[in-house]
Amino acid sequence: MAFKSLIAFVALAAAVRAAPTAVCPDGTRVSHAACCAFIPLAQDLQETIFQNECGEDAHEVIRLTFHDAIAISRSQGPKAGGGADGSMLLFPTVEPNFSANNGIDDSVNNLIPFMQKHNTISAADLVQFAGAVALSNCPGAPRLEFLAGRPNKTIAAVDGLIPEPQDSVTKILQRFEDAGGFTPFEVVSLLASHSVARADKVDQTIDAAPFDSTPFTFDTQVFLEVLLKGVGFPGSANNTGEVASPLPLGSGSDTGEMRLQSDFALAHDPRTACIWQGFVNEQAFMAASFRAAMSKLAVLGHNRNSLIDCSDVVPVPKPATGQPAMFPASTGPQDLELSCPSERFPTLTTQPGASQSLIAHCPDGSMSCPGVQFNGPA
């Protein structure tokens, strides 16, 4: 696939970093003195919120990076929003109350204290850097580019700029194009984030419903499992933005898998189906594609040439598990619903077991893993 050759070139170019030119107070050598402030911030985020895990608190901050950045519109102009500008944190009683941001108040309230503690760092930089640190805890994730120097925004974004799971593919693609000229390939690439994501508000009867069977690992399972025949719902049925899932079984806090209507639609639309299918069992390709698309998303509203490359202070992510994509137990090739005849589907094995396995609620496999939740204005 031509996309894969292009992404491989981009990944190689991104690996070439400038030689360190500054020494931070802790002795770390970095490419620019301005990057030093992010070293204690990363440590603070890990110790206070993430605990070095790809858990719910990390998932929520990764979601925040997208919701903060996509709030920009080329057609509506500057009054609509400033993109990756930290406005979620700066206007916590405004944007978190938009329906598309339902549930984002947790991550907003968790990050607000860091604005005071690390007050040389803008809210805009805090959001994107926190997301990069959060993602580094997810095995298989790429090390994201991080550019520092975004100024804070002085106005909140308007409502209606965040894509929602009930939106049509046409509306989603138009929104991304209007936000920053994103291509369908880049849109699907960004949805690799759903491999480490869960939903709390789509179905109000359940919490932390994962989008694939491995929600604590950045892998291609989500691209496989969205292509499997839906058989039920993890909670109640007929929720806006949700369609039947192939793995709805849950027990206690181990919630069954949820399938978003928008993911299902993108996996089958002629404009995006082959892109979606092409990520199945292509871990390195998916990770590199996501990194490239995130590099574009994270600077919406800014001139990247005016920012400082501080990628060298982003923690090195945990390595991939090495586990290939597999059909979950109780499913197999007979359950595939494919919409791309031109993309060869890989030969995959099936996990052992005659019935669906429960999806663990916590990274360590347990049912109880209390998260961090600060009180705040959002």
UniProtKB/Swiss-Prot annotation:
In terms of Pfam families, this protein maps to:
peroxidase (PF00141), Peroxidase_ext (PF11895)
Q: What is this protein called?
A: Manganese peroxidase 1
Q: Where is this site: Transition state stabilizer?
A: R63
Tell me the superkingdom of the source. Eukaryota
Leader sequence range is 1-21
One GO biological process this protein is involved in is:
cellular response to oxidative stress
Give the family from UniProt: Belongs to the peroxidase family. Ligninase subfamily.
Q: Which organism does this record belong to? A: Phanerodontia chrysosporium (White-rot fungus)
Q: Which GO terms describe its molecular function?
A: heme binding; manganese peroxidase activity; metal ion binding
Q: Which SUPFAM superfamilies match?
A: Heme-dependent peroxidases
User: Which residues are glycosylated according to the annotation?
Assistant: N97, N152, N238
* Binding-site residues, Ca(2+) 1: D68, G83, D85, S87
The compartments listed are: Secreted
Q: Which PANTHER family match?
A: CATALASE-PEROXIDASE, THYLAKOID LUMENAL 29 KDA PROTEIN, CHLOROPLASTIC-RELATED
Q: Which UniProt keywords apply?
A: Calcium, Disulfide bond, Glycoprotein, Heme, Hydrogen peroxide, Iron, Lignin degradation, Manganese, Metal-binding, Oxidoreductase, Peroxidase, Secreted, Signal
One Gene Ontology cellular component: extracellular region
List, alphabetically, the InterPro entries matched: Ccp1-like (IPR044831), Haem_peroxidase (IPR002016), Haem_peroxidase_sf (IPR010255), Ligninase (IPR001621), Ligninase_C (IPR024589), Peroxidases_AS (IPR019794), Peroxidases_heam-ligand_BS (IPR019793)
Q: Does the keyword ATP-binding apply?
A: no
Query: EC?
Result: 1.11.1.13
Q: Where is the active site?
A: H67 (proton acceptor)
The record lists heme b as bound by H194
Question: Principal place where this protein is found?
Answer: secreted
Q: Does the keyword Calcium apply?
A: yes
Q: Which cofactor does it need?
A: Ca(2+); heme b
Per UniProt, Mn(2+) binds at E56, E60, D200
Cystine pairings recorded for this chain:
C24-C36, C35-C310, C54-C138, C274-C340, C362-C369
Binding residues for Ca(2+) 2: S195, D212, T214, T217, D219
